[in-house]
């Protein structure tokens, strides 16, 4: 993705599980995005379920895709 200065950090809720470890996440502002897990979450075998609250990073250049960086308890 882009440099750290160009990323937006937002919170949302997992709405749907998609094939290939992708997720439909609805952000707090109501905008839907397609997200994938970051590498450290994959290596730690962290799984997401529908309804989980997550923190995502988005590029300022493409506001339709995101990366899940944290799953809230």
From Swiss-Prot:
GO MF, one example: rRNA binding
UniProt entry keywords in alphabetical sequence: Cytoplasm, Initiation factor, Protein biosynthesis, RNA-binding, rRNA-binding
CC per GO annotation: cytosol
Pfam families tied to this protein: eIF-1a
Main localization (coarse): cytoplasm
Domain S1-like, chain residue ranges per copy: 1-73
InterPro entries linked: NA-bd_OB-fold, RNA-binding_domain_S1_IF1, S1_domain, TIF_IF1
The keyword RNA-binding appears for this protein: yes
UniProt subcellular location: Cytoplasm
Coiled coil feature spans: none
HAMAP family from the UniProt entry: IF_1
Protein family membership: Belongs to the IF-1 family.
Quaternary organization: Component of the 30S ribosomal translation pre-initiation complex which assembles on the 30S ribosome in the order IF-2 and IF-3, IF-1 and N-formylmethionyl-tRNA(fMet); mRNA recruitment can occur at any time during PIC assembly.
Function: One of the essential components for the initiation of protein synthesis. Stabilizes the binding of IF-2 and IF-3 on the 30S subunit to which N-formylmethionyl-tRNA(fMet) subsequently binds. Helps modulate mRNA selection, yielding the 30S pre-initiation complex (PIC). Upon addition of the 50S ribosomal subunit IF-1, IF-2 and IF-3 are released leaving the mature 70S translation initiation complex.
UniProt xrefs under PANTHER family: TRANSLATION INITIATION FACTOR IF-1, CHLOROPLASTIC
Name of the protein described by the UniProt record: Translation initiation factor IF-1
Organismal lineage: Bacteria, Pseudomonadati, Chlamydiota, Chlamydiia, Chlamydiales
């Amino acid at each position: 993705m882009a440099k750290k200065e160009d990323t937006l950090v937002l919170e949302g809720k997992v709405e749907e599980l998609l094939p290939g470890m992708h997720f439909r996440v609805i952000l707090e502002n109501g905008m839907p995005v397609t997200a994938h897990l970051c590498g450290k979450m994959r290596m730690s075998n962290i799984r997401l379920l529908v309804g989980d609250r997550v923190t995502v990073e988005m590029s300022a250049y493409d506001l339709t895709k995101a990366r899940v960086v944290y799953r809230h308890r």
